[in-house]
């Protein structure tokens, strides 16, 4: 069946966007997504391990909504609890985009390697650092200039990319 975007929410509804969003698609409050009967899947892109993102994801799962998130901080801090809650409520919690710079590895590990024991995984675990290092090498530009470019492109957190750059992101 086709994917239909029923509603959207954002901190700043008046922000200029590349797509036009009809007024009737905007939710008055982001938590409405977790309660509405006509919503099956909630996609969380808020960010942060607590606050609005945590509230939305927990409420959605409790209300039997499938959840998709790219939120590393949330999964790192609350992943075990969220997974158990999703299993209890018989819904999916999908977070592949939150891991290893978006490399599609979670499903392979969960479904394809269940009888094997994984002791180590080597690879690029942080897409932001990978982008910055590759761009510095290719463009010969400075770290600060490339970081600013990464922030403008949305690859690094604006204002303070500490989580992206100090290793805690990859540790998550």
Residue ranges, per PLM feature:
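N-terminal glycine-/serine-/threonine-rich beta1-alpha1-beta2 phosphate-ribose binding loop
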Residues: 1-63
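General beta-strand structural signal in soluble alpha/beta enzymes
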Residues: 26-28, 43-44, 68-70, 93-97, ...
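Glycine-enriched alpha-helix->loop->beta-strand junction motifs that scaffold or abut catalytic
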Residues: 63-66, 127
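General structural feature for long, well-ordered alpha-helical segments within catalytic domains
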Residues: 4, 29, 38, 52-56, ...
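Structural signal for hydrophobic packing residues in well-ordered secondary-structure cores
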Residues: 1, 12-16, 34, 50, ...
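Conserved anion/nucleotide-ligand pocket segment
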Residues: 111-171
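Rossmann-fold NAD(P)-binding glycine/threonine-rich loop
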Residues: 46-63, 70-110
């Amino acid at each position: 069946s086709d994917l239909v975007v029923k509603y959207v929410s954002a901190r700043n509804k008046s922000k200029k966007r590349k797509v036009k969003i009809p007024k009737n698609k905007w939710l008055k409050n982001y938590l409405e997504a977790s309660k509405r009967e006509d919503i099956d899947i909630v996609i969380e892109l808020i960010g942060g391990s607590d606050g609005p993102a945590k509230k939305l994801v927990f409420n959605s799962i409790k209300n039997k909504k499938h959840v998709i998130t790219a939120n590393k901080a949330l999964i790192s801090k609350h992943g075990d609890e969220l997974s158990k809650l999703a299993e209890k409520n018989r819904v999916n919690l999908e977070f592949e985009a939150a891991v290893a710079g978006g490399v599609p590895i979670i499903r392979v590990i969960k479904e394809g390697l269940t009888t094997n024991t994984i002791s180590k995984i080597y690879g690029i675990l942080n897409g932001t650092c990978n982008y910055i290092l590759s761009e510095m090498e290719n463009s010969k530009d400075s770290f600060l200039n490339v970081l600013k470019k990464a922030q403008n492109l949305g690859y690094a957190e604006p204002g303070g990319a500490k989580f992206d750059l100090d290793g805690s992101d990859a540790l998550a």
